Amino acid sequence: MTAAEAPLPPLAPRERTATTAAERRTGSPLAVSLSGVRKSFGDKTVLSGIDLEITRGEFVVLLGPSGTGKTTLLRLLSGLEPPDGGDVLVPRQRTVVYQEPRLIPSKRVLANVSVGQKRAQLTRDNARRALAEVNLADKERAWPATLSGGEAQRVALARALVREPELLLLDEPFAALDALTRLQMQDLVGDLVARHRPAVLLVTHDVDEAVRLADRVLILDNGGFAVDVDIDLPRPRDRNDPEALRYRATFLAQLGVGRPSSTRQDIS
């Protein structure tokens, strides 16, 4: 098993004795809790005491300028990067889908989906169901080299789903896809998340993607969250809806697009 397919290391859960604000807001159990989390690399502070709660079934999108710590936060939640301080609560069942599908070239599609899983026959059955969910039931005998970029990324999604994660981490999974395939993948991910109900954290630079998919958008800047706002729009979402355009314009302004960074605005 390669490092890309190895199970994520467990983090010891922390006891909780009270219902959190996030649980009261969404009505779902808490999946992620960060309290006062800090992370630095040398003299550069990336995360300076952040707090974050995500509940089961909540789709959170993380935006931010390059170098602000988005991928560091995702790696911290996956267990691949230790915090320098603070408390971390994440579920043991969690998985990551990256920008590159990271399929094993020497294994067929079905074997890629079931890699690392035990109980071979049950795993194959589950892998076939996962492939059907991503509309690749006819590709189980295919080799990775024969797949398009979108198909390979769907295999990576199926591999994540077969593990039944309570937390799904998405690290710019659509960034390398063409515009049409990107929209199709966004719709597919939205449908799969609605069906399986994991907590989701999607890291992206695409504001339109955030407005299209998110229940909640965070913008990371200067070591903390400059924005933490719910997206209160019906689904499916029309990118030309006036409210969607308002969210888009506000997020772009906060990211410093189209105006000097000194005039970034807060939203409530």
Swiss-Prot record:
<dbReference type="GO" id="GO:0005886">
    <property type="term" value="C:plasma membrane"/>
</dbReference>
<dbReference type="InterPro" id="IPR017871">
    <property type="entry name" value="ABC_transporter-like_CS"/>
</dbReference>
<dbReference type="InterPro" id="IPR050166">
    <property type="entry name" value="ABC_transporter_ATP-bind"/>
</dbReference>
<dbReference type="GO" id="GO:0016887">
    <property type="term" value="F:ATP hydrolysis activity"/>
</dbReference>
<keyword id="KW-0472">Membrane</keyword>
<comment type="similarity">
    <text>Belongs to the ABC transporter superfamily. Aliphatic sulfonates importer (TC 3.A.1.17.2) family.</text>
</comment>
<feature type="binding site">
    <location>
        <begin position="64"/>
        <end position="71"/>
    </location>
    <ligand>
        <name>ATP</name>
    </ligand>
</feature>
<feature type="compositionally biased region" description="Basic and acidic residues">
    <location>
        <begin position="13"/>
        <end position="26"/>
    </location>
</feature>
<feature type="region of interest" description="Disordered">
    <location>
        <begin position="1"/>
        <end position="27"/>
    </location>
</feature>
<comment type="function">
    <text>Part of the ABC transporter complex SsuABC involved in aliphatic sulfonates import. Responsible for energy coupling to the transport system.</text>
</comment>
<keyword id="KW-0547">Nucleotide-binding</keyword>
<dbReference type="Pfam" id="PF00005">
    <property type="entry name" value="ABC_tran"/>
</dbReference>
<keyword id="KW-0813">Transport</keyword>
<dbReference type="GO" id="GO:0005524">
    <property type="term" value="F:ATP binding"/>
</dbReference>
<keyword id="KW-1003">Cell membrane</keyword>
<protein>
    <recommendedName>
        <fullName>Aliphatic sulfonates import ATP-binding protein SsuB 3</fullName>
        <ecNumber>7.6.2.14</ecNumber>
    </recommendedName>
</protein>
<feature type="domain" description="ABC transporter">
    <location>
        <begin position="32"/>
        <end position="247"/>
    </location>
</feature>
<dbReference type="InterPro" id="IPR003593">
    <property type="entry name" value="AAA+_ATPase"/>
</dbReference>
<dbReference type="InterPro" id="IPR027417">
    <property type="entry name" value="P-loop_NTPase"/>
</dbReference>
<comment type="subunit">
    <text>The complex is composed of two ATP-binding proteins (SsuB), two transmembrane proteins (SsuC) and a solute-binding protein (SsuA).</text>
</comment>
<keyword id="KW-0067">ATP-binding</keyword>
<keyword id="KW-1278">Translocase</keyword>
<dbReference type="InterPro" id="IPR003439">
    <property type="entry name" value="ABC_transporter-like_ATP-bd"/>
</dbReference>
